[in-house]
């Protein structure tokens, strides 16, 4: 894609994002939160997995955990399946570390059924060393640098803009300690993460039927394969700062160089397990990638794309997709590359950079930050436009 075409597509996306923000949802919770949240049904389920008799005690492995809530006043036919990112669990969506309601409650109050996932080998899904292999533990310095206090480290150009963390963002602060207590070890093997959760996520959709996927960070690389495997069951994808950028991860170095590509190549462009491409790859064949000569602007990375002619992603192209990127996160430097990669592969998508719709100062954990409701409102606006129409009833498990 030429530099001129890149600029034109970026302008179109910004105009579309601005239009979405013109008629915002009522994101104030002062009235809603004062009222009890009335549920028609609540419960949990496990999806996927099998009993492994080759291991001592024959454990169940490969399953995810999902808790669901169905509001009494159900207004939308498709539930939202919320999938957390690396080092996290579903608690990312069920409340904030300073005690406010989370995105799960936000969308429940607006008439959506919600399924909140703990990924395979994480949280209530359970972890077995013999089956899943090594894990990477949460790290205090990385948690502060990437999530709670990037402005103190300046590892990427936008980090100094971070203002929305609800607290002092340091050990001993009750809000930070409440957040840090939620951090979990994650499987070290990214391909295993993605394969296990793709299969369990597909099994969840087989149980509950048509649904909206809301992914964040690491689970972005899970959402694409789930949709690729079950394209007829995914009504929309909301990818909140999805795992990226395409082809190569980034090491953040600070000024003046800022960015360095990680040598390892993502085999599907968007992750470490295969996706369905057209024309299909032959046995042993790999995707070929090329990098921009210059970034779209100085504070952004140079994007990788497919070498021409680009293969298409047929199983994703009929699914409405929203990619959201905040102002101060490390993703602010590269989420536009993910949007461009999908576009090149024939997958239409909406890219919203939050400052373009007047929402400033957020980091990567935006669903926990002070203005989390405003961001949920942007998502709600987009869903209203992408999936018009409402339904009076919806079964919790079909």
Segments and roles (model prediction):
Residues 76-85:
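Short beta-strand element of the alpha/beta-hydrolase
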Residues 214-223:
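Gly/Ala-rich beta-loop-alpha elbow adjacent to hydrolase catalytic centers
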Residues 323-325:
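Short beta-strand/loop motif that positions the catalytic acidic residue
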């Amino acid at each position: 894609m030429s530099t001129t075409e890149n600029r034109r597509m970026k302008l179109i996306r910004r105009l579309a994002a601005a239009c979405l923000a013109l008629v915002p949802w009522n994101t104030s919770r002062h009235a809603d939160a004062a009222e009890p949240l009335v549920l028609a049904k609540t419960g949990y389920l496990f999806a996927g997995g099998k009993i492994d008799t080759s291991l001592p005690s024959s454990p169940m492995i490969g399953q995810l955990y999902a808790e669901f809530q169905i509001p009494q006043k159900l207004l939308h036919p498709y539930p939202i399946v919320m999938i957390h990112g690396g080092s996290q669990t579903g608690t990312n969506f069920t409340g904030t570390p300073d005690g406010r309601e989370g995105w799960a409650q936000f969308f429940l109050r607006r008439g959506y059924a919600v399924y909140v996932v703990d990924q395979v080998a994480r949280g209530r899904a359970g972890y077995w060393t013999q089956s899943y292999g090594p894990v990477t533990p949460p790290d205090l310095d990385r948690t502060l640098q990437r999530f709670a206090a990037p402005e103190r480290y300046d590892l990427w150009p936008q980090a100094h803009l971070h203002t929305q963390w609800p607290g002092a963002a340091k050990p001993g602060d009750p809000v930070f300690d409440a957040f840090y207590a939620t951090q979990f070890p994650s499987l070290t093997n990214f391909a295993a993460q993605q394969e296990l959760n793709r299969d369990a996520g597909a099994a969840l959709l087989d149980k509950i039927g048509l649904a909206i996927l809301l992914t964040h960070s690491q689970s972005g690389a899970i959402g694409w394969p789930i949709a690729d495997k079950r394209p007829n069951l995914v009504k929309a994808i909301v990818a909140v700062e999805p795992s990226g950028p395409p082809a190569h991860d980034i090491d953040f170095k600070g000024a003046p160089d800022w960015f360095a590509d990680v040598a390892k190549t993502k085999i599907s462009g968007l992750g470490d397990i295969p996706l369905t491409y057209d024309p299909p790859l032959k046995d042993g064949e790999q995707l070929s990638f090329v990098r921009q000569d210059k970034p779209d602007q100085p504070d952004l990375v140079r994007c990788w794309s497919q070498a021409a002619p680009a293969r298409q992603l047929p199983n994703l192209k009929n699914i409405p997709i929203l990619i959201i990127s905040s102002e101060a996160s490390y993703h602010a430097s590269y989420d536009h590359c993910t949007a461009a990669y999908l576009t090149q592969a024939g997958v239409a998508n909406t890219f919203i950079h939050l400052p373009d719709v007047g929402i400033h100062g957020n980091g990567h954990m935006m669903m926990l930050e002070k203005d989390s409701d405003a961001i949920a409102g942007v998502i709600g606006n987009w869903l209203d436009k992408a999936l018009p129409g409402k339904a009076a009833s919806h079964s919790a498990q079909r």
